Amino acid sequence: MQRRRGRMLAQGLGLAAAFGVLIALPQTAAEGVRSGLTLCGQVILPSLFPFFVCSNLFVLLGFSARVSARFGGLAARLLRLPPNAGSAFVIGMTGGYPAGVQAVGLLYERGELSRDEAEHALAVCNQAGPSFIFGFLGGAVFAHPGAGALLCGVQLAAAVLTCRLTAKPLTAAQRAHSAPQQAQPDFAAAFSEAVRRAGMSAIHVCMFVTVFSVLSGYLRLAAGAHLPADAAPLALGALELSAGCAALRACTLAPVWKLCIASFLLSFGGLSILAQSRAAAADAGLEGRQLPGCKMLQGAIAAALTLLLAPLVQVERWCAPTLGASTMMETAGPVMLLLSSVLLLYFRKKYHSILREGRV
């Protein structure tokens, strides 16, 4: 009871502070809304909405079940995912946030995944899309196609490792599980339902992007004088992915560290992506409780892989190195590897204990 009162008091004070800030600084909120809607209109809707429609049609017309029947064994062996979840993993890798969550939710609604299988698949089938990685990061931020290729490959490898680390091997019954027979809808009905679902998902995404754009604006205003430019990508990216990635352009860190930050942000997604994903999961009756932990783990793996691979692809040649980069590499490199190793061991132990106790 005391804890509930304390939580209610904190929420009330937070709301009062939010109202006060909106009344005192309405221009910042208005600019954040304009920036968020511009991002939605110019980047998010053109890239996501058509893919939402196509991915919904892919599932509703039964192609997902056919592909899973033929290639589901590969997903079970490589990813330790149920065979029917393999198509959702591919949709998540190619469609961007939160297309994978939407695909998993639809598979769950159709009975092709159990609740436990869907909850785990939500956490590992949700990735940034290649259009954002190559177009925005590889083109606008790093201005080198190699950066986009490295980030995309690292994200895929980190996603596969996260799948394997957070799931136990499938039983023979799970490997052999097939989707229940579904009534085959005609194309017109499937198309109408696909567009409706895509529209609702796109609206949810844009709402969260706009809200977190406002929060990012207030964060810049509050911490602008005290937040170093090199810390801005992580601070802003923890709220909203695109804002954090855009801040990398003004960052003076060495290219390898900018790539490590970009890898972490891409795989983690930020609070905005997590909120979008939880909302999409809730539409299907799922909770998505494993999302934050799995995305943090994937971000740590992605940053560590980038740090290991960067010297091999000579990323320092992509742009001029900044002063002090060698010193920073010598001191911070072992620290990042140590933290990533600790995170890997912690989450592996945690999720295996949860699975053994049957609490997932």
What function would you assign to each model-found segment?
Residues 114-116, 131-132, 258-351:
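C-terminal transmembrane helix pair
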Residues 61-63, 191, 195-266, 270:
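Transmembrane helical segments that form the transport core of multi-pass membrane transport proteins
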Residues 42, 46-107:
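Membrane helical hairpin/interfacial module
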Residues 19, 59, 117-125, 181, ...:
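Short, amphipathic, aromatic/basic-enriched membrane-interface segments that mark the entry/exit
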